[in-house]
Regions:
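Short basic/glycine-enriched coil/helix segment immediately N-terminal to the Walker B
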Residues: 48-52, 68-84, 252-255
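Conserved interdomain linker/interface between the two RecA-like ATPase lobes of SF2 helicase motors
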Residues: 137-208
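Conserved helicase/translocase motor-coupling segment
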Residues: 188-281
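Post-DEXD/H (motif II) to motif III coupling segment of the RecA-like Helicase ATP-binding lobe
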Residues: 74-83, 90-162
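Conserved RecA-like ASCE P-loop NTPase motor core of nucleic-acid helicases/translocases
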Residues: 1, 115-117, 197-203
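Inter-Walker segment of RecA-like/P-loop motor cores
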Residues: 4-65
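Conserved RecA-like helicase motor-core motifs
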Residues: 2-21, 137-149, 217-234
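Conserved segment of the helicase C-terminal RecA-like domain
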Residues: 253, 293-306
Length: 306
């Protein structure tokens, strides 16, 4: 490869099903290619994937930094020379968080830049992650009391600084109503009959299947959850983005109901006119609300105004 060509690697269990990744040129780039990106077979081995120039992976690949396992030194070598970006850092449970903090200790000892992203990270959790990266147990508690939003917190390895960021986006007030399962059909009909689309996010696959069956006689229903086999899930995700994504049309959205589980609440750029959700922790509820009136669309149904 030419000196300026960069090797990219997608490192997760369904990488072979990702069409964008599979369409990147493999081996030595052709002279007429100007993308500068290639896939090299040498890096396709899971133990060596982290050594590529750019790597996109699921978080469990990074958490293995904290484990005593064969070939872990290759992971340390690969990540220590990169900028590590971890998205949705609020979403990890107590078990994963222990491994995350240990991994941050390693990265901090290498002076590896780490960027943690979240829209709903509690202040106490923010401080515990910084303590792990710096390898310290205590510091000025005024940093934990800072409640600005959006808030940027950073450290150069010695001092900790925080800065409130300006937010130019439109603020919205969300109307919240409680309902029981028997009322869901009527709530949905009120929106879909006026040309709107509805998202229904529940906490189990069984409930998602139940609501999809319940609603299919009154609306177009798309069911999406994590138990679909990977090829089907990839097709459904593309269909979902086409129907209710940023570039979706009023025709594709009209009368549509998307029923799913927690896989709908993160990392999908989709937009519902009305959202129905099970009870859930507040940070997850805010994530789900992020799929409500996400894009500017002009007029929405009267029954789905915020």
């Amino acid at each position: 490869a030419e000196q300026n060509d960069k090797v990219v690697q997608l490192n997760h269990g369904s990488a072979a099903l990702n069409s964008l990744f599979q369409n990147i040129q493999r081996g030595i780039p052709q002279e007429e290619s100007d993308s500068g990106l290639i896939i090299h077979n040498w890096f396709c081995d899971s133990k060596k994937a982290c050594l590529a120039d750019f790597v996109t992976a699921t978080v469990d690949q990074m958490l293995m930094l904290a484990l005593k396992r064969k070939h872990v030194m290759l992971l340390h070598l690969g990540l220590s020379e990169k900028v590590v970006v971890i998205d949705e850092v609020h979403a990890y449970d107590a078990y994963m968080s222990e491994y995350l903090e240990m991994a941050l200790q390693w990265l901090g000892s290498y002076n590896t830049p780490v960027i943690l992203l979240s829209a709903t990270l509690p202040s106490a959790r923010r401080m515990s992650l910084i303590r792990a990266y710096l390898g310290i147990k205590k510091f000025d508690d005024r940093f934990e009391k800072e409640q600005g939003y959006p808030l940027l917190t950073w450290t150069d390895g010695k001092d900790i600084r925080q800065q409130r960021l300006s937010y130019d986006g439109a603020h919205k007030t969300v109307s919240v109503k409680t309902c029981v399962s028997d009322d869901v059909v009527q709530f949905v009909k009120n929106v879909t009959e006026n040309g709107g689309c509805v998202g229904v996010i529940v906490n189990t696959v069984r409930r998602a299947q139940m609501f999809a069956e319940l609603l299919q006689d009154n609306a177009k229903v798309l069911l999406y959850h994590a138990q679909f086999v990977l090829p089907d899930r990839a097709k459904k995700e593309k269909q979902l983005v086409d129907l209710v994504g940023k570039n979706s049309t009023p025709e594709s959205r009209s009368g549509l109901v998307v029923v799913g589980t927690q896989v709908l609440e993160q990392s999908l750029d989709i937009d519902f006119d009305m959202l129905i959700t099970d009870m859930c922790p507040m940070d997850l509820l805010l994530q789900r609300m992020g799929r409500l009136h996400r894009h500017e669309r002009g007029v929405r149904p009267d029954t789905a105004q915020t």
